[in-house]
Design a protein with these regions (language model features):
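Cell-envelope/extracellular polymer assembly enzymes that use nucleotide-activated donors
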Residues: 53-56, 87, 242
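A conserved acidic beta->alpha catalytic loop
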Residues: 92-101, 121
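N-proximal low-complexity "stem/linker" segments adjacent to membrane-targeting elements
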Residues: 1-66, 70-73
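Acidic helix N-cap motif at the loop->helix transition within catalytic regions
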Residues: 69-70, 97-106, 153
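Short, acidic, metal-binding catalytic loop of nucleotide-sugar glycosyltransferases
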Residues: 73-85
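Basic/Trp-rich segment in TM-proximal cytosolic loops or flexible interdomain/linker regions
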Residues: 1-11, 34-48, 208, 268-317
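Short aromatic/hydrophobic "clamp" motif used to bind/position activated sugar donors
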Residues: 141
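Long helical/loop segments within the catalytic core of UDP-sugar-dependent glycosyltransferases
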Residues: 34, 111, 117-118, 124-128, ...
């Protein structure tokens, strides 16, 4: 009797594990198409009238001498947003290369636009962001990596989600990643991945009503929402995943805006790509293990995120 039950349970589990990638893939495709056709066009916000809110752009920098100057000059001169309505805060996180010297020169060039916060020892992005929150003048924070350039209208487009009707519940909006360095086969493969698979996954998650993660490279946060969840979790390997879960657990909306584009450099070697993906995977697993309990305490309130949790758990298995 027990053998019969055991064998049938094993057969059922094997069937689930074998069929899930197929069934899950079909569900992702259908839900992403539904999101794009029926929801995105209706939700696409228009530009708003009136004085735009002040935005603080956070740029984390640890040994970024190759890209920091280009990024800061772009942010200071190319964004289509009133100059008096945004600032750039660079967190120089224990850099040992020429990053500090370059930033000093840029401060002379952009004295009213650029501020630099120096962290003596490298403590990570989340730690630097939590320090910068105490200096930020803006009610909204744009997280922007040192090798990332958002499209020129990005600030207007991001802010339109917060300013639209019902936008007071929006905690963060993440944009659409595009690859800027396309010189190696590894980078080209990742370009195709971001343009198709990642966008489809985020659209599918939005169809269910939530997001598994924000993009650490370019996301706009409501500062009040960041404070509401206790800031960025420095102990988490991937703070962008952790804060997405924290915000949604506390009732804030997390949105994906596919029409807001930003361009970033991706790893150009298989070794570097593997290191990046391993960090993403370990961060996702860590968040799953540490945050799922809080979501399950209120399953009805967090119903929209349950399919995302289940999918990620099965993906790990």
């Amino acid at each position: 009797m027990y053998d019969w039950i055991f064998n049938h349970v094993v057969d059922f589990l094997v069937l689930v594990l074998v069929s899930y990638p197929i069934v899950g893939g079909i569900a992702f495709i259908i839900s992403s198409i539904y999101q794009r056709v029926f929801n995105e066009r209706r939700q696409l916000p228009a530009y708003f009238d009136g004085e735009p809110p002040f935005v603080s752009i956070f740029v984390p920098a640890h040994n970024e001498e190759d890209s920091i100057e280009s990024t800061i000059v772009y942010l200071a001169t190319q964004l289509n947003y009133p100059d008096h309505c945004y600032e750039i805060l660079v967190i120089n996180d224990g850099s040992t290369d020429a990053t500090g010297e370059i930033l000093s020169q840029l401060q002379v060039r952009f004295p009213s636009k650029l501020r630099v916060l120096t962290v003596v020892d490298n403590r990570g992005k989340a730690h630097g962001y939590n320090i910068a929150l105490g200096y930020a003048r803006g009610a909204f924070i744009l997280s922007n990596d040192a090798d990332t350039k958002p499209e020129t209208d990005a600030l207007w487009k991001y802010m339109s989600y917060f300013k639209r009707e019902g936008g007071q519940n929006v905690g963060a909006v993440t944009g659409n990643m595009l690859v800027s360095n396309r010189t190696t086969l590894t980078a080209l493969v990742q370009m195709n991945e971001l343009n198709s698979i990642v966008g489809m996954i985020k659209r599918s998650q939005m169809a269910y009503g939530g997001l598994f993660a924000f993009s650490g490279a370019n996301t706009m946060y409501r500062k009040a929402a960041v404070f509401d969840v206790g800031g960025f979790q420095a102990e988490q390997p991937t703070e962008d995943i952790a804060i997405a879960w924290d915000m949604q657990t506390n009732g804030w909306q997390a949105l994906f805006a596919p029409h807001i584009r930003f361009f970033l450099d991706m790893p150009e070697t298989l070794r570097a790509m593997f290191k990046q993906r391993r960090r993403w995977a370990s961060g996702g697993i860590y968040v799953l293990l540490t945050k799922t309990g809080a979501l399950l305490k209120h399953p009805i309130k967090n119903l929209a995120t349950m399919p995302i949790i289940i999918d990620y758990a099965f993906s790990i298995v």
